[in-house]
């Protein structure tokens, strides 16, 4: 299981979820992607993306003015 990171701070929505989609093509089953983003709708966007993509949102939490989450593939 590999853990990859994506720093999407400064990107406006929906760019963080588009970056997640691009990264998802490189992920294998069981891999984890940790994402840090600060756009206003990121939490709901990542929840929706995981539901549509059938990926597991392991957790999401605030980190300063941003949100950090882990998605399992």
Labelled PLM ranges:
Residues 1-73:
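Domain-level signature for proteins that mediate thiol-based redox and metal-cofactor handling
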């Amino acid at each position: 299981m590999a853990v990859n990171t994506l720093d999407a701070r400064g990107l406006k929505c929906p760019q963080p979820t588009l970056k997640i989609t691009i990264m998802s093509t490189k992920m294998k089953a069981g891999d984890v992607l940790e994402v840090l983003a600060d756009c206003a709708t990121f939490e709901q966007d990542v929840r929706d993306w995981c539901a549509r993509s059938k990926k597991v949102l392991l957790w999401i939490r605030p980190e300063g003015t941003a949100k950090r989450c882990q998605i399992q593939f």
